[in-house]
Swiss-Prot record:
Gene name, Swiss-Prot/TrEMBL: phnC
Catalytic activity entry: phosphonate(out) + ATP + H2O = phosphonate(in) + ADP + phosphate + H(+)
NADP recorded as keyword: no
Positions of ATP binding: G36, L37, S38, G39, S40, G41, K42, S43
CDD domains in the cross-refs: ABC_PhnC_transporter (cd03256)
Protein name per its UniProtKB record: Phosphonates import ATP-binding protein PhnC
Amino acid sequence: MSAVRFEGVTKRFGQTLALDEVSFTVEPGEVVVLLGLSGSGKSTLLRHVDGLHGASAGRVIALGTDVGQARGARLRELRRRISFVFQQFHLVDSLSVLENVCTGALGRLRGLRLGLVTYPRAVRLEALEHLERVGLASQAFQRADTLSGGQQQRVAVARALMQRPEILLADEPVASLDPESSAQVMGLIREIASERNLTVLCSLHQVELALSWADRIVGLRSGQVVLDKAAGDLDHQQAVAMIYRAGPLRAIA
């Protein structure tokens, strides 16, 4: 069973066509990068996977669930199995790094409230393990706002892992980072995906990063899929030509 399947997904916002009959699948454990310019539909498509957006036509199947038909407890259970890492880190500056990571457990454990003192020891230890994995265990008790941008995004990745997801969605996770930090964060996501058989669907606009870290690249332009290929079968020039250059839309597989 595919981890995610898009079947003719179309999305309109008023008169604006954001997605135009998008169809492709993401297999379990696969790292797929959505590549395209701002406004190409990448973020909109990601938000269909956990039901933040609903399709105007077509459907999305995630972890065996028809997302558009999921309601109540069924939708909550689906979202528990999916984590999201955003371009903006969304850390709580006044909390410690460890406390921020612990908040990732709020969605799966009942009776927890924001604040370190309410977290069971097992939750704190798990959070420390994730911080160790992202190389920030020594900063666990610092305030989150004392970290660099790259470090804060690594905290966001650790927080996402606290949810114990089966799918990780990442929306331009390195857009605000310098090249070195970008490579570190993408490398970390790639390594964790391999270790945990974690399915990753990530949006980027940097071609070289996508080619370096993805199993497969799906290119979007004007809401349409114009490219769907294994990253190893593409070079920089091909990707740029298909995704970023003007001209008639023509999908290649």
